[in-house]
Amino acid sequence: MKKIMKEKHVVPDEVLTKEFLSQFKTEADVSKFLKQLHAQVLEKMLEGEMDAHLGYEKHSVSGNNSGNSRNGSYPKKIQTEHGEAVIPIPRDRNGQFEPIVVPKHESRGLSIEKLVISLYAKGMSVSDIEEEMREIYEIELSTSAISIITNKVHQAAQEWQNRPLDPVYLIVWMDGIVFKVRDNGKIINKTVYLCVGLKQNGLKEVLGMWVGKSESSAFWMGVLTDLKARGVQDILITCTDNLNGFTDTIRTVFPQSSTQICVVHQIRNSCKYVVYKDKKEFTADMKNIYNAPNKEVAAAELDNLEKKWGGKYPYAILSWRNNWDDLTVFFQFPLEIRKIIYTTNLIENLNGKIRKYTKSKLSFPSDDAVKKMVYLSLMEIEKKWTMPITNWGLIMNQFMLIFENRIQI
């Protein structure tokens, strides 16, 4: 992508004098100079980022009593086209500064294209990026050029969505996140449905995203069929909300899979029928059900709940009765596995992180725009998914004992 620089960034011929050029005796001299120049440019760009982060320039009186200030810098080695260089990375006193042009945990500065995509991933519009590039980095890029760059994200998202998947996942959590999207001239709610799988090495992986107007078992049938077409042969445990018909849909595509309905969703659903003054006590009584040591004790606690509250809130109890078998699947497993399957907290936490990246967007112009933004958010989030889940060694041994014929080591 060719960038258009401001006129003042073009090196005039009068600067390239014989006197200036005489300092370079070898190609190594030129390379050393360019490395130093590259480092100085990055340093200036980082200073511009810090100015924008704090809202005032260095040594400005505007920073007095602002609540945050510069706090020196730390040296960082980076790789340039001309070799390794050390540049100072500025810090702020509150520890909130996140450099963009030289990202944390990376040893290379971003290219212009990657810089634009990084800004786009943070929820900035094309016009916002154009202004940011001009004011902070002093780089002139037209909005059309920025659009061309961000449109490449759509192709990358499609390739990611269609990539092959592992044949077996130990657990797959399923949930959705709602966005405002323009559709036929109207702003409506649409849901991006996500599946997160637990791999046989203990790492989490987002398997895909699907956009729909409303959740239904027929919709999820399409999602599960897509997973199978991309290579998934077996899912040991699925964790879902209590959508009517969802469990049967899963069994149609993955007949051996055990499905656990999210207990937290069930608690919220029951509490809808309970008046505010009783909710605290009612919720405490419900905890006795899912904190029970086994299914038999849990059933007795449900009976106790019904004796105490059934006359006043029959519908709050009825939903437990109607979904009992799918709500209590987790009792079949050891405690370490129970903790990660009886709720969809893992994927709800993921949704919360996506919200942080998309909070500046009140609505999206199209489904594709939503997909691009969520895809970029997921790529940023997955960078931190580098370690197996807690107690992984113990959990894997438990899975191998319980599902020894279905796990391929």
Language model: regions and residue ranges:
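RNase H-like nuclease fold core
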Residues: 90-93, 100-106, 139, 143, ...
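Active-site phosphate-binding and catalytic loops of NTP-dependent enzymes
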Residues: 52-64, 68, 155-167, 179-184, ...
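Conserved beta-strand -> loop -> alpha-helix junction used to position metal-binding or nucleic-acid-contacting
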Residues: 237-244, 249-285
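Basic, short loop/linker segments at the boundary and entry of helix-turn-helix/winged-helix-like folds
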Residues: 67-122, 138-148, 167
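Acidic/histidine-rich catalytic cores and adjacent linkers
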Residues: 255, 288-409
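Subset of Sec-pathway N-terminal targeting signals
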Residues: 1-72, 79-82
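DNA-recognition alpha helix
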Residues: 127-138
